Amino acid sequence: MKVFQYVNIVTCDQDFHVYLDGILAVKESQIVYVGQENQEILKQADQIIDCQGAWIMPGLVNCHTHSAMTGLRGIRDDSNLHEWLEGYIWPAEAEFTPEMTTKAVKEALTEMLQSGTTTFNDMYNPNGVDIAEIYEAVKASKMRCYFSPTLFSSDVETTAETIARTRSVIETIKGYQDPNFKVMVAPHSPYSCSRDLLEASLDLAKEENIPLHIHVAETQEESGIILKRYGKRPLDFLDELGYLDHKAVFAHGVELNEAELARLADSQVAIAHNPISNLKLASGIAPVVQLQKAGVAVGIATDSVASNNNLDMFEEGRTAALLQKMKSGDASQFPIETALKALTIEGAKVLGMANEIGSLEVGKQADFLVIQPQGKIHLQPQENMLSHLVYAVKSSDVDDVYIGGEQVVKDGQVLTVNL
Protein backbone atom coordinates (compact mmCIF):
# COMPACT_ATOMS: atom_id res chain seq x y z
CA MET A 1 0.00 0.00 0.00
CA LYS A 2 1.24 3.48 -0.93
CA VAL A 3 0.35 6.43 1.30
CA PHE A 4 0.55 10.10 0.32
CA GLN A 5 1.13 12.07 3.53
CA TYR A 6 0.99 15.78 4.39
CA VAL A 7 -1.44 16.58 1.59
CA ASN A 8 -4.41 18.90 1.27
CA ILE A 9 -7.11 16.85 -0.41
CA VAL A 10 -10.08 18.14 -2.41
CA THR A 11 -12.23 15.03 -2.81
CA CYS A 12 -14.98 16.43 -5.08
CA ASP A 13 -17.30 13.85 -3.51
CA GLN A 14 -21.01 14.48 -2.98
CA ASP A 15 -20.46 16.46 0.22
CA PHE A 16 -17.29 18.09 -1.13
CA HIS A 17 -15.08 16.96 1.72
CA VAL A 18 -11.74 18.74 2.01
CA TYR A 19 -9.00 17.29 4.21
CA LEU A 20 -6.18 19.62 5.24
CA ASP A 21 -2.91 17.93 6.15
CA GLY A 22 -4.52 14.58 5.39
CA ILE A 23 -3.46 11.31 3.82
CA LEU A 24 -4.48 9.36 0.74
CA ALA A 25 -3.83 5.61 0.68
CA VAL A 26 -3.72 3.60 -2.54
CA LYS A 27 -3.56 -0.18 -2.90
CA GLU A 28 -2.99 -1.46 -6.42
CA SER A 29 -5.26 0.79 -8.50
CA GLN A 30 -7.83 1.78 -5.88
CA ILE A 31 -8.19 4.29 -3.09
CA VAL A 32 -8.41 2.49 0.25
CA TYR A 33 -8.36 5.49 2.57
CA VAL A 34 -8.82 9.23 2.27
CA GLY A 35 -9.06 11.57 5.23
CA GLN A 36 -7.19 12.93 8.19
CA GLU A 37 -3.96 11.27 9.27
CA ASN A 38 -4.53 7.73 10.54
CA GLN A 39 -1.74 5.91 12.36
CA GLU A 40 -3.14 2.47 11.57
CA ILE A 41 -3.06 3.24 7.85
CA LEU A 42 0.47 4.58 8.10
CA LYS A 43 1.62 1.41 9.89
CA GLN A 44 0.30 -0.72 7.01
CA ALA A 45 2.03 1.32 4.31
CA ASP A 46 4.69 -0.22 2.09
CA GLN A 47 5.66 3.26 0.95
CA ILE A 48 5.01 6.70 2.43
CA ILE A 49 5.38 9.74 0.19
CA ASP A 50 5.88 13.07 1.95
CA CYS A 51 3.95 15.53 -0.24
CA GLN A 52 5.05 18.56 1.79
CA GLY A 53 1.70 20.32 1.80
CA ALA A 54 0.81 19.69 -1.83
CA TRP A 55 -2.74 19.92 -3.13
CA ILE A 56 -4.41 16.78 -4.47
CA MET A 57 -7.67 16.62 -6.40
CA PRO A 58 -9.26 14.10 -8.80
CA GLY A 59 -7.96 13.80 -12.34
CA LEU A 60 -9.86 16.08 -14.71
CA VAL A 61 -12.48 14.69 -17.11
CA ASN A 62 -12.64 16.24 -20.59
CA CYS A 63 -16.14 15.44 -21.84
CA HIS A 64 -15.72 16.35 -25.53
CA THR A 65 -12.61 16.71 -27.65
CA HIS A 66 -11.06 15.83 -31.01
CA SER A 67 -7.50 14.71 -30.36
CA ALA A 68 -6.74 13.75 -33.98
CA MET A 69 -7.16 17.45 -34.83
CA THR A 70 -4.23 18.54 -32.67
CA GLY A 71 -2.15 19.19 -35.79
CA LEU A 72 -4.71 21.81 -36.85
CA ARG A 73 -4.03 24.15 -33.93
CA GLY A 74 -4.21 27.71 -35.28
CA ILE A 75 -5.42 26.63 -38.73
CA ARG A 76 -8.06 29.37 -38.80
CA ASP A 77 -8.98 32.03 -36.28
CA ASP A 78 -11.71 34.67 -36.44
CA SER A 79 -14.34 32.56 -38.23
CA ASN A 80 -17.78 31.39 -37.20
CA LEU A 81 -18.42 27.66 -36.89
CA HIS A 82 -19.85 26.77 -40.29
CA GLU A 83 -17.32 28.82 -42.28
CA TRP A 84 -14.57 27.32 -40.13
CA LEU A 85 -15.77 23.73 -40.67
CA GLU A 86 -16.58 23.90 -44.36
CA GLY A 87 -13.75 26.15 -45.47
CA TYR A 88 -10.88 24.87 -43.35
CA ILE A 89 -11.44 21.90 -41.04
CA TRP A 90 -13.16 19.38 -43.29
CA PRO A 91 -10.80 20.03 -46.24
CA ALA A 92 -7.80 19.62 -43.92
CA GLU A 93 -9.17 16.40 -42.42
CA ALA A 94 -9.62 15.00 -45.93
CA GLU A 95 -5.82 15.06 -46.23
CA PHE A 96 -5.15 13.23 -42.96
CA THR A 97 -2.91 10.15 -42.95
CA PRO A 98 -2.39 7.59 -40.15
CA GLU A 99 1.05 9.04 -39.48
CA MET A 100 -0.43 12.52 -39.03
CA THR A 101 -3.31 11.46 -36.80
CA THR A 102 -1.29 9.13 -34.58
CA LYS A 103 1.24 11.92 -34.00
CA ALA A 104 -1.60 14.36 -33.27
CA VAL A 105 -3.23 12.02 -30.77
CA LYS A 106 0.07 11.43 -28.96
CA GLU A 107 0.56 15.19 -28.72
CA ALA A 108 -2.96 15.55 -27.33
CA LEU A 109 -2.36 12.79 -24.77
CA THR A 110 0.78 14.58 -23.64
CA GLU A 111 -0.93 17.96 -23.38
CA MET A 112 -3.88 16.52 -21.48
CA LEU A 113 -1.73 14.59 -19.03
CA GLN A 114 0.54 17.56 -18.36
CA SER A 115 -2.49 19.65 -17.44
CA GLY A 116 -4.06 17.03 -15.15
CA THR A 117 -6.63 15.42 -17.44
CA THR A 118 -6.90 11.67 -16.91
CA THR A 119 -10.10 10.81 -18.83
CA PHE A 120 -11.44 12.14 -22.13
CA ASN A 121 -14.33 11.64 -24.53
CA ASP A 122 -13.15 11.83 -28.13
CA MET A 123 -14.96 12.10 -31.45
CA TYR A 124 -12.72 11.75 -34.50
CA ASN A 125 -13.08 12.00 -38.27
CA PRO A 126 -12.26 8.42 -39.33
CA ASN A 127 -10.36 9.54 -42.43
CA GLY A 128 -6.67 8.74 -42.05
CA VAL A 129 -6.99 7.14 -38.61
CA ASP A 130 -5.50 3.74 -37.76
CA ILE A 131 -7.51 2.71 -34.71
CA ALA A 132 -5.00 0.02 -33.75
CA GLU A 133 -2.18 2.58 -33.57
CA ILE A 134 -4.36 4.97 -31.58
CA TYR A 135 -5.31 2.22 -29.15
CA GLU A 136 -1.67 1.34 -28.51
CA ALA A 137 -0.83 5.00 -27.84
CA VAL A 138 -3.74 5.50 -25.43
CA LYS A 139 -3.07 2.17 -23.71
CA ALA A 140 0.56 3.12 -23.14
CA SER A 141 -0.45 6.54 -21.78
CA LYS A 142 -2.73 4.88 -19.16
CA MET A 143 -5.46 7.44 -19.88
CA ARG A 144 -9.12 6.43 -19.88
CA CYS A 145 -11.25 7.36 -22.86
CA TYR A 146 -14.12 6.92 -25.24
CA PHE A 147 -12.69 7.11 -28.76
CA SER A 148 -15.52 7.25 -31.28
CA PRO A 149 -15.50 7.49 -35.09
CA THR A 150 -17.67 10.32 -36.41
CA LEU A 151 -20.45 9.55 -38.88
CA PHE A 152 -21.20 11.98 -41.72
CA SER A 153 -23.54 11.83 -44.70
CA SER A 154 -21.70 12.16 -48.01
CA ASP A 155 -22.02 11.60 -51.74
CA VAL A 156 -19.34 8.91 -51.74
CA GLU A 157 -20.86 6.55 -49.18
CA THR A 158 -24.39 5.32 -48.55
CA THR A 159 -25.94 5.25 -45.11
CA ALA A 160 -25.61 1.47 -45.05
CA GLU A 161 -21.91 1.69 -45.94
CA THR A 162 -21.25 4.32 -43.27
CA ILE A 163 -22.99 2.22 -40.64
CA ALA A 164 -21.14 -0.93 -41.71
CA ARG A 165 -17.78 0.82 -41.53
CA THR A 166 -18.61 2.29 -38.13
CA ARG A 167 -19.84 -1.04 -36.81
CA SER A 168 -16.53 -2.59 -37.83
CA VAL A 169 -14.59 0.00 -35.80
CA ILE A 170 -16.90 -0.50 -32.82
CA GLU A 171 -16.37 -4.26 -32.94
CA THR A 172 -12.61 -3.72 -33.17
CA ILE A 173 -12.64 -1.51 -30.08
CA LYS A 174 -14.90 -3.89 -28.19
CA GLY A 175 -12.51 -6.67 -29.15
CA TYR A 176 -9.74 -5.00 -27.15
CA GLN A 177 -11.81 -5.73 -24.02
CA ASP A 178 -10.14 -2.78 -22.36
CA PRO A 179 -12.31 -0.88 -19.84
CA ASN A 180 -10.10 2.17 -20.36
CA PHE A 181 -10.70 2.36 -24.13
CA LYS A 182 -14.38 2.40 -25.05
CA VAL A 183 -16.55 3.71 -27.85
CA MET A 184 -19.80 5.55 -28.51
CA VAL A 185 -21.81 5.98 -31.71
CA ALA A 186 -20.96 9.51 -32.83
CA PRO A 187 -23.04 11.05 -35.64
CA HIS A 188 -21.49 14.46 -36.17
CA SER A 189 -24.58 16.66 -35.94
CA PRO A 190 -28.18 17.04 -37.11
CA TYR A 191 -27.05 19.29 -39.98
CA SER A 192 -24.21 17.10 -41.32
CA CYS A 193 -26.10 13.80 -41.12
CA SER A 194 -29.22 12.86 -43.05
CA ARG A 195 -32.34 11.74 -41.23
CA ASP A 196 -31.63 8.18 -42.39
CA LEU A 197 -28.12 8.26 -40.97
CA LEU A 198 -29.29 9.73 -37.67
CA GLU A 199 -31.93 7.02 -37.34
CA ALA A 200 -29.44 4.31 -38.28
CA SER A 201 -26.93 5.69 -35.78
CA LEU A 202 -29.46 5.42 -32.97
CA ASP A 203 -30.31 1.88 -34.05
CA LEU A 204 -26.61 1.00 -34.01
CA ALA A 205 -26.18 2.46 -30.52
CA LYS A 206 -29.11 0.38 -29.28
CA GLU A 207 -27.81 -2.74 -31.03
CA GLU A 208 -24.32 -2.32 -29.56
CA ASN A 209 -25.67 -1.11 -26.20
CA ILE A 210 -23.40 1.94 -26.14
CA PRO A 211 -24.08 5.68 -25.74
CA LEU A 212 -24.41 8.35 -28.41
CA HIS A 213 -22.10 11.35 -28.80
CA ILE A 214 -23.23 14.23 -31.04
CA HIS A 215 -22.90 18.00 -31.50
CA VAL A 216 -26.31 19.56 -30.76
CA ALA A 217 -27.73 23.09 -30.53
CA GLU A 218 -24.32 24.68 -31.02
CA THR A 219 -25.30 27.78 -33.03
CA GLN A 220 -28.25 29.85 -34.21
CA GLU A 221 -27.27 28.89 -37.76
CA GLU A 222 -27.70 25.20 -36.91
CA SER A 223 -31.16 25.92 -35.53
CA GLY A 224 -32.08 27.72 -38.75
CA ILE A 225 -30.81 24.86 -40.93
CA ILE A 226 -32.75 22.20 -39.05
CA LEU A 227 -35.88 24.33 -38.80
CA LYS A 228 -35.83 24.85 -42.57
CA ARG A 229 -35.05 21.20 -43.30
CA TYR A 230 -37.45 19.50 -40.87
CA GLY A 231 -39.74 22.20 -39.49
CA LYS A 232 -38.35 21.68 -35.98
CA ARG A 233 -35.52 22.95 -33.84
CA PRO A 234 -32.54 20.58 -33.40
CA LEU A 235 -33.50 19.22 -29.98
CA ASP A 236 -37.14 18.68 -30.97
CA PHE A 237 -36.02 16.92 -34.14
CA LEU A 238 -33.68 14.57 -32.27
CA ASP A 239 -36.38 13.97 -29.68
CA GLU A 240 -38.71 12.90 -32.48
CA LEU A 241 -36.07 10.39 -33.60
CA GLY A 242 -35.69 9.00 -30.07
CA TYR A 243 -32.29 10.43 -29.17
CA LEU A 244 -33.42 11.79 -25.82
CA ASP A 245 -34.51 8.34 -24.70
CA HIS A 246 -31.06 6.80 -25.17
CA LYS A 247 -27.95 7.47 -23.08
CA ALA A 248 -26.20 10.31 -24.91
CA VAL A 249 -23.61 13.05 -24.60
CA PHE A 250 -24.73 16.22 -26.38
CA ALA A 251 -21.79 18.53 -27.01
CA HIS A 252 -22.51 22.26 -26.61
CA GLY A 253 -26.23 22.78 -25.92
CA VAL A 254 -25.89 26.52 -26.45
CA GLU A 255 -29.17 27.20 -28.26
CA LEU A 256 -31.75 25.84 -25.83
CA ASN A 257 -35.07 27.41 -24.85
CA GLU A 258 -37.10 26.87 -21.67
CA ALA A 259 -39.20 24.05 -23.12
CA GLU A 260 -36.07 22.26 -24.32
CA LEU A 261 -34.45 22.59 -20.91
CA ALA A 262 -37.50 20.97 -19.36
CA ARG A 263 -37.41 18.14 -21.90
CA LEU A 264 -33.71 17.51 -21.24
CA ALA A 265 -34.47 17.23 -17.54
CA ASP A 266 -36.64 14.23 -18.34
CA SER A 267 -34.17 12.57 -20.70
CA GLN A 268 -31.06 10.38 -20.68
CA VAL A 269 -28.94 13.17 -22.15
CA ALA A 270 -25.93 14.79 -20.50
CA ILE A 271 -24.23 17.97 -21.74
CA ALA A 272 -20.56 18.57 -22.53
CA HIS A 273 -20.01 22.31 -22.04
CA ASN A 274 -17.26 23.87 -24.20
CA PRO A 275 -17.13 27.51 -23.06
CA ILE A 276 -13.93 28.69 -24.76
CA SER A 277 -14.65 27.06 -28.12
CA ASN A 278 -18.17 28.51 -28.03
CA LEU A 279 -16.73 31.96 -27.37
CA LYS A 280 -14.01 31.74 -30.01
CA LEU A 281 -16.45 30.66 -32.72
CA ALA A 282 -19.05 33.20 -31.51
CA SER A 283 -21.52 30.38 -30.96
CA GLY A 284 -22.91 31.70 -27.69
CA ILE A 285 -23.01 30.85 -24.00
CA ALA A 286 -24.72 27.65 -22.89
CA PRO A 287 -27.39 27.99 -20.16
CA VAL A 288 -25.41 25.85 -17.74
CA VAL A 289 -26.96 27.15 -14.53
CA GLN A 290 -30.45 26.40 -15.84
CA LEU A 291 -29.36 22.96 -17.03
CA GLN A 292 -27.94 22.13 -13.62
CA LYS A 293 -31.02 23.42 -11.82
CA ALA A 294 -33.11 21.17 -14.07
CA GLY A 295 -31.01 18.20 -12.96
CA VAL A 296 -29.11 17.68 -16.22
CA ALA A 297 -25.53 16.44 -15.79
CA VAL A 298 -23.09 18.99 -17.23
CA GLY A 299 -19.37 18.37 -17.59
CA ILE A 300 -16.61 20.60 -18.91
CA ALA A 301 -14.83 20.08 -22.23
CA THR A 302 -12.19 21.76 -24.36
CA ASP A 303 -13.40 20.81 -27.85
CA SER A 304 -10.40 20.60 -30.22
CA VAL A 305 -7.27 22.75 -30.15
CA ALA A 306 -8.34 24.05 -33.57
CA SER A 307 -11.11 26.03 -31.88
CA ASN A 308 -9.73 26.70 -28.42
CA ASN A 309 -6.60 26.59 -28.88
CA ASN A 310 -5.40 24.32 -26.06
CA LEU A 311 -6.52 21.42 -23.88
CA ASP A 312 -6.25 23.27 -20.57
CA MET A 313 -9.21 22.13 -18.48
CA PHE A 314 -8.39 24.49 -15.61
CA GLU A 315 -8.72 27.44 -17.98
CA GLU A 316 -11.97 25.93 -19.24
CA GLY A 317 -13.41 25.60 -15.74
CA ARG A 318 -12.47 29.17 -14.85
CA THR A 319 -14.06 30.47 -18.06
CA ALA A 320 -17.22 28.46 -17.41
CA ALA A 321 -17.56 29.98 -13.95
CA LEU A 322 -17.01 33.54 -15.15
CA LEU A 323 -19.44 33.18 -18.05
CA GLN A 324 -22.27 31.82 -15.91
CA LYS A 325 -21.88 34.67 -13.43
CA MET A 326 -22.06 37.17 -16.28
CA LYS A 327 -24.91 35.42 -18.10
CA SER A 328 -27.04 35.19 -14.95
CA GLY A 329 -26.11 38.62 -13.62
CA ASP A 330 -25.53 36.93 -10.28
CA ALA A 331 -21.98 36.49 -8.99
CA SER A 332 -23.11 33.74 -6.61
CA GLN A 333 -23.90 31.41 -9.51
CA PHE A 334 -21.50 28.61 -10.48
CA PRO A 335 -19.46 28.88 -7.26
CA ILE A 336 -16.07 27.29 -6.64
CA GLU A 337 -17.48 23.95 -5.50
CA THR A 338 -19.63 23.71 -8.63
CA ALA A 339 -16.71 24.55 -10.90
CA LEU A 340 -14.41 21.93 -9.35
CA LYS A 341 -17.13 19.29 -9.49
CA ALA A 342 -17.85 20.16 -13.14
CA LEU A 343 -14.21 19.42 -13.94
CA THR A 344 -14.29 16.06 -12.15
CA ILE A 345 -17.26 14.14 -10.76
CA GLU A 346 -19.87 15.81 -12.97
CA GLY A 347 -17.76 14.98 -16.01
CA ALA A 348 -17.59 11.40 -14.81
CA LYS A 349 -21.40 11.38 -14.54
CA VAL A 350 -21.69 12.68 -18.10
CA LEU A 351 -19.61 9.73 -19.31
CA GLY A 352 -21.36 7.18 -17.10
CA MET A 353 -18.17 6.58 -15.10
CA ALA A 354 -19.02 8.15 -11.73
CA ASN A 355 -18.83 4.82 -9.90
CA GLU A 356 -15.19 4.46 -10.95
CA ILE A 357 -13.64 7.93 -11.19
CA GLY A 358 -14.29 11.64 -10.68
CA SER A 359 -13.88 11.88 -6.91
CA LEU A 360 -11.40 10.71 -4.31
CA GLU A 361 -13.37 8.11 -2.38
CA VAL A 362 -12.65 4.66 -1.01
CA GLY A 363 -13.16 2.01 -3.68
CA LYS A 364 -12.69 4.35 -6.63
CA GLN A 365 -9.76 4.35 -9.01
CA ALA A 366 -6.78 6.38 -7.81
CA ASP A 367 -6.82 8.99 -10.57
CA PHE A 368 -5.52 12.29 -9.22
CA LEU A 369 -3.29 15.26 -9.84
CA VAL A 370 -0.80 16.89 -7.51
CA ILE A 371 0.01 20.59 -7.36
CA GLN A 372 2.81 21.88 -5.13
CA PRO A 373 1.93 25.52 -4.39
CA GLN A 374 5.19 26.36 -2.67
CA GLY A 375 7.27 28.75 -4.72
CA LYS A 376 4.33 29.70 -6.97
CA ILE A 377 3.45 33.30 -6.17
CA HIS A 378 0.09 33.20 -7.96
CA LEU A 379 -1.03 30.37 -5.65
CA GLN A 380 -0.48 32.36 -2.45
CA PRO A 381 -1.78 32.61 0.20
CA GLN A 382 -2.11 28.84 0.35
CA GLU A 383 -5.06 28.87 2.75
CA ASN A 384 -7.21 30.02 -0.18
CA MET A 385 -6.55 26.75 -2.03
CA LEU A 386 -10.08 26.23 -3.34
CA SER A 387 -10.27 29.70 -4.83
CA HIS A 388 -6.86 29.28 -6.43
CA LEU A 389 -7.83 25.95 -8.02
CA VAL A 390 -10.54 27.76 -9.97
CA TYR A 391 -9.34 31.32 -10.42
CA ALA A 392 -5.52 31.28 -10.26
CA VAL A 393 -4.13 27.88 -11.20
CA LYS A 394 -2.50 27.23 -14.58
CA SER A 395 -2.14 23.91 -16.34
CA SER A 396 1.62 24.27 -15.97
CA ASP A 397 1.17 24.18 -12.18
CA VAL A 398 0.39 20.45 -12.31
CA ASP A 399 3.43 18.64 -10.96
CA ASP A 400 2.40 14.98 -10.80
CA VAL A 401 -0.45 12.88 -12.16
CA TYR A 402 -1.51 9.36 -11.20
CA ILE A 403 -3.94 7.06 -13.01
CA GLY A 404 -5.03 3.89 -11.25
CA GLY A 405 -2.32 4.58 -8.69
CA GLU A 406 0.43 4.60 -11.31
CA GLN A 407 2.43 7.76 -11.83
CA VAL A 408 2.12 9.06 -15.40
CA VAL A 409 3.46 12.59 -14.90
CA LYS A 410 6.42 13.45 -12.67
CA ASP A 411 7.58 17.01 -12.10
CA GLY A 412 5.56 18.10 -15.12
CA GLN A 413 7.05 15.52 -17.46
CA VAL A 414 4.87 12.84 -19.05
CA LEU A 415 6.24 9.34 -18.44
CA THR A 416 3.89 7.31 -20.61
CA VAL A 417 3.78 8.89 -24.08
CA ASN A 418 6.58 8.41 -26.60
CA LEU A 419 6.48 11.35 -29.00
Model-derived segments and spans:
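Alpha-helical scaffold segments that flank or form the walls of functional sites
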Residues: 73-143, 164-176
